[in-house]
Structure formats: C-alpha cells, structure tokens
Curated annotation (Swiss-Prot):
Catalytic function, reaction form: NAD(+) + (deoxyribonucleotide)n-3'-hydroxyl + 5'-phospho-(deoxyribonucleotide)m = (deoxyribonucleotide)n+m + AMP + beta-nicotinamide D-nucleotide
Swiss-Prot/TrEMBL keywords: DNA damage, DNA repair, DNA replication, Ligase, Magnesium, Manganese, Metal-binding, NAD, Zinc
Residues bound to NAD(+): D39, A40, E41, Y42, D43, S89, L90, E123, R146, E186, K302, K326
Species name: Novosphingobium aromaticivorans (strain ATCC 700278 / DSM 12444 / CCUG 56034 / CIP 105152 / NBRC 16084 / F199)
UniProt-recorded name of the protein: DNA ligase
InterPro entries xref list: BRCT_dom, BRCT_dom_sf, DisA/LigA_HHH, DNA_ligase, DNA_ligase_AS, DNA_ligase_CS, DNAligase_adenylation, DNAligase_N
Keyword Membrane: no
EC primary class: ligase
MF terms (GO), sorted A to Z: DNA ligase (NAD+) activity; metal ion binding
CDD domains, per the entry: BRCT_DNA_ligase_like (cd17748), LIGANc (cd00114)
Function: DNA ligase that catalyzes the formation of phosphodiester linkages between 5'-phosphoryl and 3'-hydroxyl groups in double-stranded DNA using NAD as a coenzyme and as the energy source for the reaction. It is essential for DNA replication and repair of damaged DNA.
Length: 721
C-alpha cells in the first residue's frame, strides 16, 4: 500500500512491525551469520521503513532501523573494540531517478548552482564483512568488525592470516603515512574459493555456508585464528576512519594512496562528473557482475571533494555524501497454503500468509505479511491461490498478483473476534486495521507491551527476552512494567524454575536493578503511547526535561485541544487567543501555552497531542504510570552538546542563506545544542536572517527578539569550534 493511502495508525503499526523485523534480520546477518532473507528482501524492508518515516516523520521510533547500524555485539569469545570514529552504513538508491535526486540533494545542501559540477567516485559494492584496520606509524595494531557501528569485535589475530592485509604499510617517504590511520573495507571470499571451501566442508561433514558473505563472516569471527588461516579470505579497502591527518584533497586521490601503501582497492573505482556518468558506470558494472570474481550487490557513489564531505556530514546512520545504488531483485510464484492472524501490542490483527516454500535469490521464503483486511480483499486472496511475490527494492516483499483469483474457491473471511482473547475485533472509522477491543484483558496485547517495554530501543534489559517475558507472564509474575522491578522478591521462585541457576537469576536481577534510573526518552517510548516514536520521544524530553513536566503539559494541552482552544496554523502560541475576561483566563492561558509549546516541537502535531492526552486522561494508564514511577527514578533528560553561546536556545532561520543551505544551518545549530523552529514566537531566542527575510523578521522585531545575519552566525559556529 502506498504511504499516501495509510492512516497514521496504520503507519505507526507498520513501522513497529518493520523495526522488529529489521532488528531480527540484523541480528541474524551481523551477529549470527545466518540470514533468513536475501539482501534484496532486507533492502525492501529498510526501503519501506524509510518511505514511511519520510511520510510520517513524527512517528519515527527510538528503535528506528534508520538510526541503527549493524547489530550490537552480544557475548563473544572475541574481545570488544570501541571505534574511535563510528563505522557508518550507507543509504540506498534503487532507481536512476533516485541517483539524480542524490546529486541534486548534495547541490542543495552545499547551496551550489544547478549547473555546478559535482564530481563523484563510483565503485562496486562488495558483499562482505566490514572491517576496520588501525595502523599506527604504518604498523597494524588492531582490526575490528563493524558490529553496531560503535563497538565491534577484535579480530586482530585473525586478519594477520589474510594475505591482502599488510602488517606494515609501504611508505614512499618518511612522512608519507600518517601517525594514525584506520583503513576500512570488506573482508570477502571469492566465488571460486567459496565453492572449494564448501566442497571441503561437505567432505569433512562440517557446516556448509549459505553464500560467500556468510563464509567470510564465519571464517573471520573465529576464536581460533588457525581456523581463519585455513580459509581463503580477501580484503578490499573502500574508505577510512580515524586519522591523524588525511594526506589528500579528494576521495579518489586518497584511495589511490591507500593502494600505494599496499592495501587493495577496487579496480573498478572511477570518477564521474554527472549523474548520467554514474548511472552508465552502474550499468557497466551490472553487465560485468556475473564475471567478477566476487559477489557484489550494487555500486557506491561518494562525493569526491573531502572538504565537501566534511560540510555534508552525516544523518542518523549514514553520510550525506554517499549512497549505494543497489541492483534489482526477483519475482517468484508460489502457493498460499494458509492465512494466520497475529495480534500486536496495540491490538492490531495482522494477517500473515504461510507459503509453499519458494526459492527467491537463493533463499527459501515461507511467510509473507498480507498487511490488513483490505489488502486481502484487493488481491482477492484465498487459501490455495497461486500468487506472485515481488522482492524489488522499492516496496516491502509482498504479494503483487493473484494468478488464480478467478478460479472457484471458498472466500477468506477475516475474523471479527480476536483469536487470542475472543473479544470483538473492529476497524475504527477511517482506519483499515482491525483491532482487538479487549485492551489489557487480551493476553497478546499485554505480553507485546511488556516485550516492547524491555526492547532494545526502550529499557533494553539484558536477559529479559521474549521467552522470559512470556514465561513470567504465564506464571502471573508480570502484568505491568512496574512488576519487572519487583521480580527481586521472587528470586527463590525463579531459581526453582527449569533452566534458571543462581548465577543467571542474579545476572537478570542485576540487569533490572541497573535500569532503576533509566533514560527518560527510552522510558517514555517504552510506555507504548501511540504515535510517540523515536525522534518524537527524544524531542519531547529535550523540551520538557522531566516526565512529570511532560505529563502536565500533555494534560493541559489536550484539555485545550478538546475544548477547541485556537492556535496558529504554524503551532506558535498567539497571545491574542487568550483574553483575561473571566476567572478562568489564567487556566485557559496555561492550557493554550502548553498546547503551543507542544506544537512548536518539530514533528509534533495534533495527532501526537491527542495521543498524549488520551494516555494521561485514562485512569488505568495513570495507575500504570504512577506505579512505574514508584519503582524507577529517571534523571532529568540532558543532551550532550558542544558548549556554545546558543546552547539551549531556540533559533529560527529565515530568508536566503548565501554560503550554506537551510539544512546545513539547522544541523550546525543542533550540533551547538540549540533547537530550531519553523516559526517565530515568544519562545524564540534568536533569528538568523538572510536576504529576502519577510514576516518572520517583522515578528521578531515586534517581540524584541535578537536578529543576526549569516556572517554573525558563521562566527558563532567558528567560536564553538
């Protein structure tokens, strides 16, 4: 379903499902080297998530896949390494038009003329395991996998057995190599080497690897380095991380220098001066793909000028100056064997198609989401139908065609009662999702809410996973989040359970105790308030600092909204909407002020205000809230930022900026600890005005707000370092 056809509720539920699916597949791919889906299927999930987040930015979740890199390193026989410079991933493009838009986006951000040449590098994207090699004074001192981008596994002893990785870089002169330089690239296995390895593994009765990427990952991440030494691993560099200096002005020149130092780089690396050249190189590599000695899944483009890369910076998990142009995937036919219904945290009934196993891109697929009742009706799906699965990159893996819809067959009847608790299942007016009306009497919803509360993006309690939540719930030990913090009283009972020992119980209880002063934004997200997702939870806490302050603002704002209190279209508080002509004027002013305060936060609109109000007006939710806060004490929410003259202030940019784009200016402000707003109000501290500034400049003058020009803003940024 297109994003424009979705309601906010549908989008929120789909984002929740995507976050869980992608997290699962990240774990299988990065941590366990045992993926269940193809790269194209994974890309499709990520792509759909990005589309939904772009259409509904206020629904972005704290556990959003767009902010996650790889997967957190679990317990491992290999040591952990903290990356000095985060190992980022890349955003993806799937069409020529998206490549053109990427180039245009770079121009806009840098405020370049439309006809300005933007040189890019283009190289094949190897499907391997990301690795960072740290050289100090030219000698290899450490190697680490990417992990979650911040912490990876120490594989220094293992890479010593990879012939492509030199223990010492070749220097043309005494000062040719920086004192510190981290070379980053992919550890991979050539196709022929992979086939030979699997033949040896089969002959020895040992594990067969699914594909070269898994073979490379499984071979590198070995406790016994001699196992790695016996595997045919290779390495290709594609960039760098921490560096005491970068002895080049462009990406292309730096990659040539890395090659001169003795580290292999892609032989297909070229410079392109236009989007047309980039796409032409993509097609050329695509034609060579089958004949290349290693697996690739696309082409990577990077802005060539390093000073432009510095200006462009990063968003979430990816650089603005790079993108991966992925190759398309496949379609396949299979049979729909059954339709099962899953009940989610918010009561949504999601139909899941169980399929006759079908091979798509080398992976066997057995399940597919059918989204909702309307989607089943649109496709006329019935058990036994022959269907076409699409695994293209621009949508979620989905059923795109029913080949047998005209054949006589019993129709599928979507349930009108919850399969978990028997409560009536209905779709609210204007929504396509069918939801269980049982609320917290529905065990599926209660369990899902508890799972959500302890999930990685919420409280992230180690050892309290899905199976444990279900086990303790069925025993009656867990009914609400606060019960988690009372499990210490059941220590003796837990120890008596099968699979639990003194040490494992003590580890669990210690992990729970460690969360008694949780991050306030994570706690807010963990409560599962509808429409309060990732950035929204963090932005709410940035503004209100403490949870009680947020609760009071939400109660007042929702009262104002429910009573029809007027507000400006841009969400700014308008003093003219409050008149002191009654005894209740003060209270009304407070409610209006709270509403304006909430609406001034980027991404917070009436739907979020209503959701917060609904939550804090419902007696059961208040009881859960107060019970939880009797067990935990989240400290005031403070965001670490640079010490600057504008930290903590609200800034509005208006008019045309001549040396930077509006996005770049906003990114600078946020890095300095300021928050940006789209409109001027009494809460605005500073206005940065360029040529053509209009009504906002007049508003600032009327309110006595400081106004500076772009040069003064640049000086503030310079002084902050």
């Amino acid at each position: 379903m297109t994003t424009s056809a979705l309601t906010e509720a549908e989008a929120a539920n789909e984002l929740m499902r995507l976050a869980r699916q992608i997290a699962k597949h990240n774990r299988l791919y990065h941590a366990e080297d045992s993926p269940e889906i193809t790269d194209a299927e994974y890309d499709a999930l990520v792509r759909r998530n990005a589309e939904l987040e772009a259409a509904f930015p206020h629904l972005i979740r704290p556990d959003s896949p767009s902010a996650q890199i790889g997967h957190e390193i679990a317990a491992s026989p290999l040591g952990k390494v903290q990356h000095e410079v985060r190992m980022m991933s890349l955003d993806n493009a799937f069409t020529d038009e998206e490549v053109e838009e990427f180039v245009a986006r770079v121009r806009r951000f840098l405020a370049l003329p439309e006809d300005a040449e933007v040189v890019m590098t283009a190289e094949d994207k190897i499907d391997g395991l990301s690795c960072s090699l740290r050289y100090e004074n030219g000698r290899l001192v450490r190697a680490a996998t990417r992990g979650d981008g911040q912490v990876g596994e120490d594989v220094t002893a293992n890479v010593a057995h990879i012939p492509d990785i030199p223990q010492e870089l070749k220097a043309a002169g005494l000062f040719d190599i920086p004192a510190v330089f981290e070379i980053r690239g992919e550890v991979y296995m050539a196709k022929d080497d992979f086939l030979a390895l699997n033949a040896r593994q089969a002959e020895a009765g040992e594990k067969i690897f699914a594909n070269p990427r898994n073979g490379a990952a499984g071979s590198l991440r070995q406790k016994d380095a001699s196992v790695t030494a016996s595997r045919p691993l290779r390495f290709l560099a594609h960039g760098w991380g921490a560096a005491s200096e970068v002895p080049a002005a462009t990406q292309f020149e730096m990659m040539r220098k890395i090659a001169d130092w003795g580290v292999p780089v892609s032989p297909l690396l070229v410079r392109c001066s236009s989007a047309a050249e980039m796409v032409a190189h993509y097609r050329d590599i695509g034609e060579k793909r089958a004949s290349l000695p290693y697996d690739i899944d696309g082409v990577v483009y990077k802005v060539d000028r390093l000073d432009w890369q510095d200006r462009l910076g990063f968003v979430a998990k990816a650089p603005r100056w790079g993108i991966a142009h992925k190759f398309p995937a496949e379609r396949a036919e299979t049979t729909l064997d059954a339709i099962d219904i899953q009940v989610g945290r918010t009561g949504k009934l999601t139909p899941v198609g169980r399929l006759k196993p079908v091979l798509v891109g080398g992976v066997t697929v057995t399940n597919v989401t059918l989204h909702n009742r309307d989607e089943i009706g649109r496709l006329g799906l019935r058990v036994g139908d022959r269907i076409v699965l699409q695994r293209a990159g621009d949508v979620i893996p989905q059923v795109v065609e029913n080949l047998t819809r005209e054949e006589p067959r019993d129709p599928y009847h979507f349930p009108d009662h919850c399969p978990e608790c028997g409560s009536e299942a209905v779709a609210e007016e204007g929504e396509v999702d069918v939801r269980c009306t049982g609320g917290l009497i529905c065990p599926a919803q209660r369990v899902e809410r508890l799972k959500h509360f302890v999930s990685r993006a919420a409280l992230d309690i180690e050892g309290l996973g899905e199976k444990t939540i279900i086990e303790f719930f069925q025993l009656g030990w867990l009914e609400s989040p606060a019960d988690i913090f009372r499990l210490r009283k059941r220590r003796s009972e837990i120890v008596g359970r099968e699979g639990w020992k003194d040490k494992s119980v003590d580890n669990l209880l210690a992990a729970i105790e460690a969360k008694r002063q949780p991050d306030a934004a994570r706690l807010l997200f963990g409560l599962g308030i509808r429409h309060v997702g990732a950035v929204t939870a963090r932005d709410l806490m940035k503004r209100f600092v403490t949870l009680p302050a947020l609760r009071e603002a939400a109660r007042q704002a929702s009262s104002a909204a429910r009573e029809g209190e007027p507000a400006n279209a841009d969400g700014a508080y308008d003093p003219a909407t409050v008149t002191p002509d009654s005894d209740t004027a003060g209270a009304e002013a407070g409610r209006s002020d709270a509403l304006a305060d909430l609406l001034s936060i980027d991404g917070v609109g009436p739907v979020v205000v209503e959701a917060l109000g609904d939550f804090f007006h419902e007696p059961h939710n208040i009881a859960v809230w107060e019970d939880l806060l009797s067990e935990v004490s989240p400290p005031p929410y403070v965001v670490e930022t640079k010490d600057s003259a504008v930290a903590g202030k609200t800034i509005v940019f208006t008019g045309k900026l001549e040396t930077m784009s509006r996005d770049e200016a906003k990114a600078q402000a946020e890095a300095l600890g300021a928050r940006t707003a789209g409109s001027v109000s009494a809460k605005t501290d500073l206005v940065v005005a360029g040529p053509g500034a209009g009504s906002k400049l007049k508003q600032a003058a009327a309110l006595g707000i400081d106004v500076i020009d772009e040069a003064a803003w640049a000086e503030i940024v310079r002084q902050a370092g």
